[in-house]
């Protein structure tokens, strides 16, 4: 059974890398005669349960195919720049055509910090710089990519992504006294979060209403033990390679 058939039967989401590098686009076109997104569209694979990671080397036609299928994409700008893929996801065109845009970190080997605050800022700045236009990807749009749009990509927009009556209390509480967030007002709060804040400004975190981080201290794990376990694992891997 193919992945699309399985998804249709179970409602499972489908995530995959799409047009991350120019080389993979050329290789796919040589094999199939079509660019990756065009080919996926032609075989009826794309739908609202698809989340296409990267999507850096897309034509406007492919963007429209994703929009028509109600698919989502997850741009990973820090990883893309670290790997020097050369492409920049056409985010303004995606927004215009109605693609559900999200932002992601990719894996730790190609991103390292996995910092979603840094990812929002980098995405916005990369789009502005590559377009020579400081007005593209506004701060609110960048925040939406990481919250409400991400919830929609997971099919969970009625449960998470925003603070509303009836939704789960998945909440990140920032330290409003942090110098990086000051001065602050209703007018600049979102901009401060996207362009000035970092993960060090997170004070507490709630998941399903349960406080899992309180005053920067994880409540359900021993962070020291986790760090030591990671160190020992790295040393064991290094020893095996020697």
At which residue positions do the language-model features occur?
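Flexible, glycine/charged-enriched surface loops at secondary-structure junctions
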Residues: 15, 160, 240-242
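Histidine/acidic residue-rich metal-binding segments in metalloenzymes
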Residues: 1-72, 84-101, 118-121, 158
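His/Asp/Glu-enriched, well-ordered alpha-helical/loop segment
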Residues: 38, 42-49, 92-178, 183, ...
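Generic beta-strand/beta-sheet core signal
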Residues: 17-19, 53-55, 74-76, 102-104, ...
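Short, solvent-exposed cationic patches
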Residues: 227-242
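C-terminal cap of metal-dependent C-N hydrolases
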Residues: 168-227
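Alpha-helix N-cap/helix-start motif
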Residues: 29, 33, 83-87, 110-113, ...
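Short, acidic/turn-prone active-site loops that include or flank metal/cofactor-
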Residues: 20, 77-81, 107-109
């Amino acid at each position: 059974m193919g992945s699309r058939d399985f998804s249709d039967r179970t409602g499972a989401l489908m995530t995959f890398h799409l047009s991350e590098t120019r080389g993979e686009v050329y290789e796919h076109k040589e094999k199939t005669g079509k660019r990756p997104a065009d080919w996926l569209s032609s075989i009826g694979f794309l739908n609202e349960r698809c989340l296409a990671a990267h999507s850096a080397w897309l034509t406007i036609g492919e963007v429209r195919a994703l929009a028509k299928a109600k698919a989502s994409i997850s741009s990973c700008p820090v990883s893309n720049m670290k790997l020097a893929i050369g492409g920049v996801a056409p985010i303004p065109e995606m927004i215009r055509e109605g693609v559900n845009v999200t932002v992601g970190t990719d894996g730790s080997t190609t991103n390292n910090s996995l910092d979603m605050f840094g990812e929002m800022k980098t995405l916005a700045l990369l789009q502005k710089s590559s377009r020579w236009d400081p007005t593209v990807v506004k701060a609110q749009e960048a925040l939406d990519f990481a919250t409400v749009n991400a919830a929609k990509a997971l099919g969970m927009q009625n449960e998470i992504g925003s603070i509303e009556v009836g939704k789960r209390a998945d909440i990140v509480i920032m330290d409003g006294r942090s110098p990086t967030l000051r001065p602050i007002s209703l007018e600049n709060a979102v901009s401060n979060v996207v362009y000035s804040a970092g993960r060090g400004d997170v004070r507490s975190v709630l998941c399903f209403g349960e406080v899992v981080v309180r005053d920067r201290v994880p409540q359900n794990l021993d962070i020291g033990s986790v760090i030591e376990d990671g160190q020992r694992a790295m040393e064991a891997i290094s020893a095996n390679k020697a």
